[in-house]
UniProtKB/Swiss-Prot annotation:
This is Trypsin-1. The keyword Protease applies. It is found in: Secreted. It comes from Anopheles gambiae. Keywords: Digestion, Disulfide bond, Hydrolase, Protease, Secreted, Serine protease, Signal, Zymogen. GO terms for biological process: digestion; proteolysis.
Length: 274
């Protein structure tokens, strides 16, 4: 009898351990992810949910960052030679495998395709917390500006964004968490969220850091998603955030989390000259 009890206890412990491991895995999977990651380890990403189609001339700074010629993430034109995206979009990828397509409303056709010559990932990027989620891309060829290709404005170092500021996020990511990437560029208007409120919302996932900015509606419904990662969050013509991570997509009570651009303005200038 004692042997049977011991066996049952061992089985129970194994079942509990397995359940805890699965729960922990689910928590890891809420982090944002590219639509096609060169190093897929967890879900880390964002897509446009509850938004509307736009022409690229409405967001001429928008680029599609492509891994082996397939849409992977978004990005923003900073100058004729530099693009800003998320570090989790470039981690583990060689520059030779990356290109950007820009000047088109479709990520798979039109516009111009330019090779990436160099990736400058932020030295403090933390893949577990998605902190310092920034990468600069130096392009092989200089861009020619037009109505459909323009650099985005940048904030000053440590410039703040007031709570409730209306912002616009754009990209080709999913319109549903399990859907395919959008063929046509989309955007959504979302207000910024108080930092303490956002930190509380994500407390079970470790909270948010000072490098992070949150935007979205309490009731959900509008957000970025897988495939939008690395893309722009713009307010008054300035790039205030980079699509980074979140719990699901457009989930009530969980705003989208973006990498705050103002805190690395000097780093951008030092490494790109922009």
């Amino acid at each position: 009898m004692s042997n049977k009890i011991a066996i049952l206890l061992a089985v129970l412990v194994a079942v509990v351990a397995c359940a805890e491991a699965q729960a922990n895995q689910r928590h890891r999977l809420v982090r944002p992810s590219p639509s096609f990651s060169p190093r897929p380890r967890y879900a880390v990403g964002q897509r446009i949910v509850g938004g509307f189609e736009i022409d690229v001339s409405d967001a001429p700074y928008q680029v599609s960052l492509q891994y082996n010629k397939r849409h992977n993430c978004g990005g923003s034109v900073l100058s004729s030679k530099w693009v800003l995206t998320a570090a989790h979009c470039t981690a583990g990828a060689s520059p030779s495998s990356l290109t950007v397509r820009l000047g088109t409303s479709r990520h798979a056709s039109g516009g111009t395709v330019v090779r990436v010559a160099r990736v400058v990932q932020h030295p403090k990027y933390d893949s577990s917390s998605i902190d310092f989620d920034y990468s600069l891309l130096e392009l092989e060829d200089e861009l020619t500006f037009s109505d459909s290709v323009q650099p985005v404005g940048l904030p000053k170092q440590d410039e703040t964004v007031k709570d409730g500021t209306m912002t616009t996020v754009s990209g080709w990511g999913n319109t549903q968490s399990a859907a395919e990437s959008n063929a046509v560029l989309r955007a959504a208007n979302v207000p910024t969220v108080n930092q303490k409120e956002c930190n509380k919302a994500y407390s079970e996932f470790g909270g948010v850091t000072d490098r992070m900015l949150c935007a979205g509606y309490q009731q959900g419904g509008k957000d970025a998603c897988q495939g939008d990662s690395g893309g722009p969050l713009v307010a008054d013509g300035k790039l205030v955030g980079v699509v980074s991570w979140g719990y699901g997509c457009a989930q009530a009570g969980y705003p989208g989390v973006y990498s705050r651009v103002a805190v690395v303005r000097d780093w951008v200038r030092e490494n790109s000259g922009v």
